[in-house]
Amino acid sequence: MPTLLKNNTSPFARIAHAALIDAAVPDLTVQIADQWNDDPALLAVNSAGRVPCLVLADGTAIAECLLIARYADSMSAKPSPGNDAPQILSVAGLALGVCDAAVQTLVGRKIVSGNFADIAFDASPIGRKRRRTMVDGLAELDARINATPGERLDLATIAAVTALDYVALRFPDADWIPDTPRLTALRAATAERPAFRDTWPFL
């Protein structure tokens, strides 16, 4: 049976997990890994020490969320239509950029002060760039996302909703998060899909 190594907050792990659930990959198990402290179980299958990592029954390990999502779709009895379409890939890439900027903001805070809540890093040139990426990226996602979900969730939908949820999780009181009415409506419309309901991030 395949085992997904993840943590409870990583947006990249959530994208992979959501894709596996939506594709109905059978017999999936989940193992929580600590990527911040060189978890031996994680390092044994992924020398980069990053989540997500999917370990197949034969021991083959697949790292990185987009590659896991691609594998999940290949294993589905009903592959998600359009996942290789340029528009889907473009929107998914934009969402990944938002996720990466959010994660790198937290990493920067950790490096500067050792505290995720300390916002001193955010005022640095790199911190401001990360903030701009999140703000502009969410606004563009709101403009470009297909707000009508299909029977299967495409990669753009999974990545965009994950990006919105992750920014809200990590920056709950931020006044710089733009209004995203279309993306927020899509999140509400898909909230009870197992792919999102069963992967909800928490601190």
Task: List where the protein language model places each region.
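GST-like domain detector, emphasizing the conserved glutathione-binding G-site
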Residues: 1-121
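Non-transmembrane alpha-helical segments in soluble domains
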Residues: 69, 73, 89-92, 138, ...
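Surface-exposed helix-capping loop/turn segments at secondary-structure junctions
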Residues: 78, 143-152, 194-200
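GST-like fold's C-terminal all-alpha helical module
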Residues: 95-185
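Short coil/turn segments at secondary-structure boundaries
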Residues: 107, 200-203
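C-terminal end-helix/capping segment
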Residues: 178-199
